[in-house]
Amino acid sequence: DYNVRCYYRDGKWGEIEVSQSPTIDLNIAASALQYGQEIFEGLKAFRRKDGKVSVFRMEANARRIHDSAEGLCMVPVPEELFCKMVEMAVKLNKRFIPPYGTGASLYIRPLEIGITPSIGVRTATEYVFIVMVSPVGSYFKGGFTTNNICILREYDRVAPKGMGRFKTGGNYAAGMKSGQHAHDLGYASVLFLDPKEKKYLDECGPANFFAIKDGVYITPASESILPSVTNNSIMQLCRDSGIKVEERHITVDELSDVQEAGACGVKYVISADGKPGPVSTELYHKLRRIQLGEEEDVHGWNTMIDGI
């Protein structure tokens, strides 16, 4: 029904606006359209077992979009403003929050774009920050089941020391051709290799890659990978459970030695490559229980939304 907006003009953020329009008035020479000054986030609100509503790791997403803004020479959205607008968007659209027990959630998409018109290559001086929402089910049609992943060596997602660690639309556009190729071959996603040597595992489609090797949770350490809030959460759950965590380079050849593997991200938590193993399964369900209020949130990851 509603989205919320805030404009940055004359060196400051203005008042929050509530809109029912799905469109914005944008100059065709805006920096977002001409030169890609656009960043976004993705997080979820859940209807919990107790009937209350919570948003998972809102502050972490606020910090990440701040980093993305700095990476694209944009004016960062203050964390307080980010959180306030997310909460407003959830409250205004409360009728779209799926019921507890359905496996669905309310997906929240914060978006910041440069709106200053300029044909010359320069950073914008004016921006708009928008928060929109949509009810969603599982990202992959199979949910937490088998989703086969392939390596396509002829494609790179990002350049070394490039923009891969920021959440900007260009990175996703760069993966569309390879993703289409993978789908045509019968796979759900592409596991990219590092763009420099084509030796180490990198991003896994729109998500982080992980594997379980001899009881150790391993995930690639790469400056071209978007730092996943979900992966960060899973690694913390591993440490809480006494599972060793290693963030390091993982070679392609090492894949033959792992017992479990898959992708993790906000949209589907964990998607196993092949048959889900016991460690992946427990981590998936543990994180879901925390999100749904079925298990104690010892790290304070959930923000409760009052009044709904």
Segments predicted by a language model, with ranges:
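Helix-start/capping segments and mature chain N-termini
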Residues: 1-89, 111, 118-308
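Extended, Lys/Arg-enriched charged tracts that mediate electrostatic binding to polyanionic substrates
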Residues: 98-113
